[in-house]
Amino acid sequence: MDYIGAVQGIPVCFDAKECRADTFPLQNVHEHQIDFMGKFERQGGVSFLLIYYTERDELYYMRYRQIKKFWDRGMQGGRKSFRYDELEPDWTMQLKNGYFVPYLDYIQKDLDLRD
């Protein structure tokens, strides 16, 4: 994990990834990371991946439940990757000023969907 801590009083853990192509191989996420994120979520925390698609110059906030869905599919013999077109468009972040990452807005959005 790239960050484990509290953001505005909310327990948060995330890992940042980079992808050049529109297909993200699940081998870029390790089993121990999925396990840790799951435990963190069960204890009331917010876990997610930030995936930067370099060719698109887009950043994607992937909620734990989404990465877990793709992970489980791979473990059950399905695709060991996910495609860009499988992502939920509402979780694509627009970079501000070319570098600012507005992840706090997406943490709040994630929390709002849990209530």
PLM feature segments, named:
Residues 15-17, 46-50, 111-115:
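Charged, low-complexity, helix/coiled-coil-prone segments
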Residues 3-21:
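Conserved catalytic cores of phosphodiester-cleaving nucleases, focusing on short active-site segments
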Residues 17-43:
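Mg2+/Mn2+-dependent nuclease catalytic core
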Residues 1, 60-115:
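Non-catalytic C-terminal interaction segments of nucleic acid-processing enzymes
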Residues 38-68:
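Nucleic-acid nuclease catalytic cores
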Residues 13, 22-25, 58-59:
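Short acidic/glycine-rich loop or secondary-structure boundary segments that cap or lie
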